[in-house]
Amino acid sequence: MQFIDQANIILKAGKGGNGIVSFRREKFVPAGGPSGGNGGRGGSIILVADNNLQTLLDFKFKREIIAEDGCKGGPNKRSGASGEDTILKVPCGTEIRDFKTGIILGDLTKNKESLTIAIGGRGGHGNAYYLSNQNRAPESFTEGQDGEIWEVQLELKLLAEVGIIGLPNAGKSTLISVLSSARPKIANYPFTTLIPNLGVVRKVDGNGCLFADIPGLISGAADGVGLGHDFLRHIQRTKILVHLIDSIAENPIHDFEIIEQELRKYGKGLIDKERIIVLNKMELVDDDYLQIITKKLEELSKKKVLAISSSLKKGLSSLLFEVWKRI
């Protein structure tokens, strides 16, 4: 399935139905009074969060959604039927903004949470509404009001508690696959992962914790280079970041600094998030070299640095222990 995490759409609520002009025409009521009914309300457009969805793909080619109009009034003071509301399902974690102003209209983070965006127009009045002592046979009516029109931007931000970040080929997909039941595409070349992979990792008490493997970031990501902003936004909601570094990279220290710099440049509090620094592929380097890299990283980050082997499943208990301590 294609991963779409942004969509711009136009929402048009339904127009209210018109009121009508009508008079009672019954056999024994030769001079019947006004009986024109009111129009029905136009349908509104409501966004509803659905935890079964993981992408905004439904809106890729559906850029304009129009709700149903209300029906006109009827004789004998019958009101027209209201237009049916249009329900749009979106993934949990969808933020809704006014496209023109950028103002946040809502943020749907819980399953079945809803937000009415475009409200349907009110129905018009039929001539029965205008009956008075001064006017016993009104011929006035009003048309239904137009429904609201909104142009909005939908932006999906994943609700994972733990985000796994690092340069391409650091081993993020392998790590999430051994920690959870997720089965991401894995290969020995950069940018294998082009969408965030989600996996539930079980705690000792049986409760699940959602991990997200964020696609490989590169230098300049905060400025939109590579996958850039497309995926940096997904770590905004995480509680913890696991910064994975490839031990066999040409310069692991430089790799660490690249990601730290991108977090700092992107802003929005990313650099202040709790981070666990992890050296991966420890089985492929000798112990002396591993100790040297670990010491340098600890001096730079002012944090404890863990060493693991995702493929051999070494050091994972220590990593999870550090994660659970921070959640």
Curated annotation (Swiss-Prot):
Domain called OBG-type G: residue spans: 160-327
Keyword Nucleotide-binding among UniProt keywords: yes
Residues in Obg domain copies: 1-159
GO biological process: ribosome biogenesis
InterPro entries per the UniProt record, alphabetical: G_OBG (IPR031167), GTP-bd (IPR006073), GTP-bd_Obg/CgtA (IPR014100), GTP1_OBG_dom (IPR006169), GTP1_OBG_dom_sf (IPR036726), OBG_GTPase (IPR045086), P-loop_NTPase (IPR027417), Small_GTP-bd (IPR005225)
Pfam family, one: MMR_HSR1
One GO term describing the cellular component: cytoplasm
Ligand binding (Mg(2+)): S173, T193
GO MF entries: ATP binding; GTP binding; GTPase activity; magnesium ion binding
Primary role: An essential GTPase which binds GTP, GDP and possibly (p)ppGpp with moderate affinity, with high nucleotide exchange rates and a fairly low GTP hydrolysis rate. Plays a role in control of the cell cycle, stress response, ribosome biogenesis and in those bacteria that undergo differentiation, in morphogenesis control.
Protein name: GTPase Obg
Source organism: Prochlorococcus marinus (strain MIT 9312)
Gene that this sequence comes from: obg
